[in-house]
Amino acid sequence: MRQTKTGILLANLGTPDAPTPEAVKRYLKQFLSDRRVVDTSRLLWWPLLRSVILPLRSPRVAKLYASVWMEGGSPLMVYSRQQQQALAQRLPETPVALGMSYGSPSLESAVDELLAEHVDHIVVLPLYPQYSCSTVGAVWDELARILARKRSIPGISFIRDYADNHDYINALANSVRASFAKHGEPDLLLLSYHGIPQRYADEGDDYPQRCRTTTRELASALEMAPEKVMMTFQSRFGREPWLMPYTDETLKMLGEKGVGHIQVMCPGFAADCLETLEEIAEQNREVFLGAGGKKYEYIPALNATPEHIEMMANLVAAYR
C-alpha cells in the first residue's frame, strides 16, 4: 500500500501588500469582487465599486492600515506567518503552507508549494472558527477553481470549522482568564464577531448558530453567569440589515446605562488584524468611553501563542 504524504494549508482572508492607497485599492477590488462576499447584481455592483467605493475608501483605509502596520507587514500577515512557522516546527515531518483568499500569498501559490513537496493529501484549515459562506465558502470555491486546472489532484480534507472544538474553547478561556487577572474582572465580557448580512443567514448560512455555539461553550468554560456575557456583531457594510445586535451601538447603549468596565474579545479571529486592532481596540473603545463607560480592554486574538498552535496541531491530526 502506497504511503500518503500529507501537507497542511492554512487559509485566511488576506491583506494589502502595503499601507498605501494603491495597494489597498488592489486588495479591496479583489475582495469586494467575490460573489461570496457581495452577491449584488454585477450590473449594479461593478459601477458602484469602481467609481465610488474604491476611490473613496482606499485612501481612508490605507491610513488605518498605516496606523497598525508592523515591521514585517500588516498584523494579519505577521501573525499568520508566525502561525505557519510555529505549526511547521510543531509538525516537522509535515509541510505547512499559508494561503490567502485575497492578496498574497495566494491560495494557488500555497497549493503549488505543497505539491512541490510531493504531497498527495492536503489538509485545508481555514482559520475561521465559525463557518460562513463569505469566508470558509470562499476558500472552498477558490480551492475548487485551483484544482480544476490540475491534471493530477491530491486528496483533500477540508475542515469546515471548529466553533466548539475543546482545545479552541480552552485556549479562549485561558486568554480571558489572563486578561481578568491583569485588568480585573469586568462588569461584562463582550464577544464581538464579524457580521454578515441577515439575508445570508435567512438563506441558510449557519454562521450565527456557530457563533452562538462558541459563545455558549466559552461562557460555560469560564463558569460565567449568562448576564455577564454578551454576543454582538461588528463591521456592517452597506445599507441592508446585518446580524444584530451591532457592536458599536451596543457599546454606546451600555455606556449610557452606566456599565463601567467592559472587556471585549473577538473569538472569530484567529489572528489580530486591522479590524480587531483599529476598529475594536481603538474606535469602539472611544464609543464606550464617550458614552460614559469608565474602563475598556480588548483581549487579543490567540495569534501564534503555544496553546493556539497546539490546538491547530491537534485539529489537523485527525485528518492526517
UniProtKB/Swiss-Prot annotation:
Pathway: Porphyrin-containing compound metabolism; protoheme biosynthesis; protoheme from protoporphyrin-IX: step 1/1. Its main location: cytoplasm. The keyword Metal-binding applies. Keywords: Cytoplasm, Heme biosynthesis, Iron, Lyase, Metal-binding, Porphyrin biosynthesis. It is an enzyme of class 4 (lyase). SUPFAM superfamilies: Chelatase. The keyword Zinc does not apply. GO terms for molecular function: ferrochelatase activity; metal ion binding. Fe cation binds at H194, E275. It comes from the Bacteria. Pfam families: Ferrochelatase. InterPro entries: Ferrochelatase, Ferrochelatase_AS, Ferrochelatase_C, Ferrochelatase_N. Signal peptide: none annotated. Its EC number is 4.98.1.1. It catalyses: heme b + 2 H(+) = protoporphyrin IX + Fe(2+). One of its GO terms (biological process) is heme biosynthetic process. It is found in: Cytoplasm. GO terms for cellular component: cytoplasm. Catalyzes the ferrous insertion into protoporphyrin IX. Monomer. Belongs to the ferrochelatase family. This is Ferrochelatase.
